[in-house]
Amino acid sequence: MTVLSFIQARELVSTIEQEKTRARVLLDLGLTATNVDINYRFKEVEFSDSKISFKHLNEIANDGEICYYLEKRKSPQKLKIFSADTNLFYKLIPSRDAPTIEISGIKMHRTQERTPWQDTIDKISSLQPLKGRILDTCCCLGYTAITAAKEKDVTQVFTF
């Protein structure tokens, strides 16, 4: 699945304005760079698993509030869901690097003055020395578990 935010969309719009036929962008929550093709004849950007029209791309470029996902032959969809079981609303919020989850209006990471990765590093640093077995209790997007697992004296990370 391709995930886009205003950040990637603006990069692609800029590439289109420069009349380039190929771009390299981060489409998997900031993990790896991917080459995409720009088709001026059909006015769309072609990803390995989907396409998006220039019109929809511009709409996403102007929406800094939420991430979108793309599926074959469908319009971009906002990454959001309401759980009737918990009565909570979840959505994926973009930031300068990795996104964060917002649960009923509360962001799980700071995103104004810090990025989610920086926020996670701050939290882990406040717990030093970190060693042995670690319990991660939130398990939103895994930033804390990933960061804790990289600490040299941590032997295991449990999440739930």
Each predicted region: which residue ranges?
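Conserved SAM-binding motif I beta-strand of class I
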Residues: T155-F160
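Conserved alpha-helix/loop element of class I SAM-dependent methyltransferases that forms part
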Residues: R114-R133
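Surface-exposed cleft-lining segments at the edges of enzyme active sites
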Residues: I106-Q112
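Short, basic/glycine-rich phosphate-binding loops at helix/coil junctions
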Residues: A98-I106
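Conserved SAM-binding loop of SAM-dependent methyltransferases across substrates and taxa
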Residues: C140-V154
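Class I SAM-dependent methyltransferase core
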Residues: D136-C138
